[in-house]
Each structure stands twice: as C-alpha cells, then as structure tokens.
Amino acid sequence: MKPVSLAKYIQKSPFLTKLLLPISNAYVHLSGYRKYGLRYDDLMLEENDDTQKALSRLPKMESYDRVYRIRRAMQLSIENKILPKSEWTKPEEDYHYLRPVLAEVIAERKEREAFDALIVKKPETQAHATSSPAHAH
C-alpha cells in the first residue's frame, strides 16, 4: 500500500500553505541539520540503488560539495559542536539538488520494469488459422 501524502493538496491551497508554513519552518529549525551546514537532500540514505544512480549523475562540483558538507557535519558531531550561526545553511541555500535527479531515476526504473514485464504475442494470421490442404485427409 502506498503511503498517503497531503503535500500536493496543501500546496494547492493558499490558506493551508499559509497556515502550515510556520510549522514547517519550525520543524526544519528543530531538526538541526542546517546548524551543521547540511542541506535537506544531504540527509537522503545512500544505500538505495536509485539514490546511488542519482548521486552518480550529479555534476562533479555538486557531488564534491555534498561530500564536503557531510564530512564536516560528521566531524562537528563527533566533537559535539555546531557551526557558528553565520555558517549555518540559509533557507535560500537549502534547495533540492538531488530529489529531481532521483525522481528521474525512479521513473526510468519503473518504465524499464514495465517493459521487462511486457509479454509480446505474435498475432495469428489467416493462413495459420485455417488448416492447410496438406494436413486435410
């Protein structure tokens, strides 16, 4: 069963968006990943095959920056420190750089699976449908 998501419904409604945006911003702030200089997409698990393929499609500089942010965050976590507030990830810097690529990879995989499951049947022709005179006795 596919999980239910209200995100699209909320985004279509200006009232709900305005109502829930402060809650969303508070949640992002409390999650704390920006205090370590991370972006939201940095938190995606790499163990997934689709994510691995999406990561391999990132531009070199974006991939390098991602690894740097993760290593710096791990070092800060080991030292029980956070970045100075001036170095926290700002909301305008926290854009989705991996999610669009991942969506493309997943769509390609689903399309490939659909074609792999496709059964090709040879259509019967009229010549095969009627018995040939050689077999009629």
Swiss-Prot record:
GO CC term (a single one): mitochondrial inner membrane
Q: Where does it primarily localize?
A: mitochondrion
> Which Gene3D superfamilies does the record cross-reference, listed alphabetically?
Cytochrome b-c1 complex subunit 7 (1.10.1090.10)
Q: Does the keyword Endoplasmic reticulum apply?
A: no
Which compartment or compartments is the protein found in? Mitochondrion inner membrane
* Gene Ontology biological process terms, A to Z: mitochondrial electron transport, ubiquinol to cytochrome c; proton transmembrane transport
* Keywords recorded for this protein, A-Z: Electron transport, Membrane, Mitochondrion, Mitochondrion inner membrane, Respiratory chain, Transport
Is Lyase among this UniProt entry's keywords?
Answer: no
Membrane topology listed for this record: Peripheral membrane protein
Similarity field? Belongs to the UQCRB/QCR7 family.
Please describe the quaternary structure of this protein. Answer: Component of the ubiquinol-cytochrome c oxidoreductase (cytochrome b-c1 complex, complex III, CIII), a multisubunit enzyme composed of 3 respiratory subunits cytochrome b, cytochrome c1 and Rieske protein, 2 core protein subunits, and additional low-molecular weight protein subunits. The complex exists as an obligatory dimer and forms supercomplexes (SCs) in the inner mitochondrial membrane with cytochrome c oxidase (complex IV, CIV).
What the protein does comes down to: Component of the ubiquinol-cytochrome c oxidoreductase, a multisubunit transmembrane complex that is part of the mitochondrial electron transport chain which drives oxidative phosphorylation.
Q: What is this protein called?
A: Cytochrome b-c1 complex subunit 7
Please name the source species. Answer: Schizosaccharomyces pombe (strain 972 / ATCC 24843)
Identify the coding gene: qcr7
